[in-house]
């Protein structure tokens, strides 16, 4: 029995970046031998075991063969005679197909085992497929795109890009289940440069299949006085990258991605103006979230940002009454944490514009001060003083909030 650390841990070690977790492959063992040594079986489709002390995953060396469409359509073969090279050959990219032997005490020993020249491609900053078997698993397109968001200075090898396009043309991407698409998109959005993920997906044609609402934004012009970058797709990528640079949460980054979807459906005869695009964005976003099973916290923030970002940009023009109505409409009084994320997404929208990345955004501070004032109103005390008429209570609380905001901002109602 020989144990090897494989994949991302070796890649990251060679790149000099922190290794988050390790994957292990065991060569020359049977499931019975693993169990006898205290490993706990957890794999469903193929033998994966948890180490009795560290609880890290150890998989028996295996090969795989495509038997049906989609990423579930594989038949696995594992046996003590499956070699390390055979196991590495089934992996997606050369930079993920390297290994080092592990000693009994868990330390890495010996040289890097690199049968597919992954070290060469690391030095060249290239994503390259290990073999033509890459075409058998459509998830690999999403994974490669996600890696592009993490390693933003890497490029895709020409022959690898050609394989990805063949997969898209063959409909392989259409077989992906929504949960897996969302999982990879979400992970890519949380990387350092999400725009690189979308660039790769566009280059191979996959974005039009999995997120046609986003793909349709490129080539749509905007007013240059508001958007010096002009192209809506370019703008949205700048917004997402700004959100990533600020280390904003996944809901904020998803809201940044989807806030302008409606601009793709603006009639040609009114371009480059986009009057009413906020409502059209909401209409596109709802079925998108349903289709990809987007988590509620991401969906809810994205919807309110899509609907209200134009209004939020104009809050410097609002009086106290309009601000309180805005807080009520966005549920900011009950959900201040979500409203804070809404401010982040809208600030990213304002700064995701060519040459305007550092422009002031006083709207955010104005709204923070105003919301704090509105939430300081003691609705319970007003209710006790007003009586049992719910309509009168509601009106009194509303008026008190307007007065509080007006006082805090020193503005008229």
From Swiss-Prot:
What keywords is this UniProt entry annotated with? ATP-binding, Hydrolase, Magnesium, Metal-binding, Multifunctional enzyme, Nickel, Nucleotide-binding, Nucleotidyltransferase, RNA repair, RNA-binding, Transferase, tRNA processing
- PROSITE patterns reported in the protein's UniProt record: HD (PS51831)
Q: Which cofactors does it use?
A: Mg(2+); Ni(2+)
UniProt remark on cofactor binding: Magnesium is required for nucleotidyltransferase activity.
Q: What is its EC number?
A: 2.7.7.72, 3.1.3.-, 3.1.4.-
> What are the HD domain coordinates in residue numbering?
232-333
Please report which protein family the annotation says this sequence is part of: Belongs to the tRNA nucleotidyltransferase/poly(A) polymerase family. Bacterial CCA-adding enzyme type 1 subfamily.
Biological function: Catalyzes the addition and repair of the essential 3'-terminal CCA sequence in tRNAs without using a nucleic acid template. Adds these three nucleotides in the order of C, C, and A to the tRNA nucleotide-73, using CTP and ATP as substrates and producing inorganic pyrophosphate. tRNA 3'-terminal CCA addition is required both for tRNA processing and repair. Also involved in tRNA surveillance by mediating tandem CCA addition to generate a CCACCA at the 3' terminus of unstable tRNAs. While stable tRNAs receive only 3'-terminal CCA, unstable tRNAs are marked with CCACCA and rapidly degraded.
Q: What is the protein's name according to its record?
A: Multifunctional CCA protein
Which source organism does the UniProt entry give? Burkholderia multivorans (strain ATCC 17616 / 249)
């Amino acid at each position: 029995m020989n144990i090897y650390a494989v994949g991302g841990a070796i890649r990251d070690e060679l790149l000099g970046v922190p290794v988050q977790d390790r994957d292990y492959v065991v060569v020359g063992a049977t499931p019975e031998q693993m169990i006898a040594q205290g490993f706990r079986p957890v794999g469903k489709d193929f033998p994966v075991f948890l180490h009795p002390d560290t609880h890290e995953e150890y998989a028996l060396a295996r090969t795989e063969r495509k038997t049906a469409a989609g990423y579930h359509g594989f038949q696995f073969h594992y046996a003590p005679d499956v070699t390390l090279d055979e196991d590495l050959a089934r992996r997606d990219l050369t930079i993920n197909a390297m290994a080092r032997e592990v000693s009994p005490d868990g330390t890495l020993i010996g040289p890097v085992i690199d049968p597919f020249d992954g070290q060469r491609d690391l030095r060249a900053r290239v994503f390259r497929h290990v073999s033509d078997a890459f075409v058998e698993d459509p998830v690999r397109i999403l994974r490669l795109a996600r890696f592009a968001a993490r390693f933003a200075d890497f490029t895709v090898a020409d022959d690898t890009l050609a394989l990805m396009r063949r997969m898209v043309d063959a409909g392989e991407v259409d077989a992906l289940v929504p949960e897996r698409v969302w999982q990879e998109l979400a992970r890519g959005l949380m990387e350092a440069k999400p725009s690189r993920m979308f660039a790769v997906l566009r280059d191979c044609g996959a974005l039009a299949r999995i997120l046609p609402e986003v793909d349709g934004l490129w080539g749509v012009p905007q007013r240059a006085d508001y958007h010096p970058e002009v192209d809506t797709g370019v703008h949205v990528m700048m917004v997402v990258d700004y959100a990533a640079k600020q280390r904003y949460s996944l809901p904020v980054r998803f809201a940044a991605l989807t806030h302008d979807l409606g601009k793709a459906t603006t009639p040609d005869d009114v371009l480059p103006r986009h009057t009413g695009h906020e409502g059209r964005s909401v209409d596109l976003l709802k079925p998108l979230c349903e289709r990809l099973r987007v988590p509620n916290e991401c969906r809810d923030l994205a919807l309110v940002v899509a609907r209200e970002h134009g209004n939020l940009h104009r809050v410097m023009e609002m009086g106290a009454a309009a601000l309180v109505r805005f807080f009520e409409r966005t549920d900011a009084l009950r959900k201040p944490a979500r409203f804070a994320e809404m401010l982040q997404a809208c600030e990213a929208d304002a700064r995701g514009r060519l040459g305007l990345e550092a422009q002031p955004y006083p709207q955010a501070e104005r709204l923070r001060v105003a919301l704090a004032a509105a939430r300081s109103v003691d609705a319970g005390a007003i209710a006790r003083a007003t009586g049992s008429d719910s309509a009168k209570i509601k009106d009194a609380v509303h008026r008190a909030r307007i007065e509080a905001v007006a006082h805090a901002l020193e503005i008229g109602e």
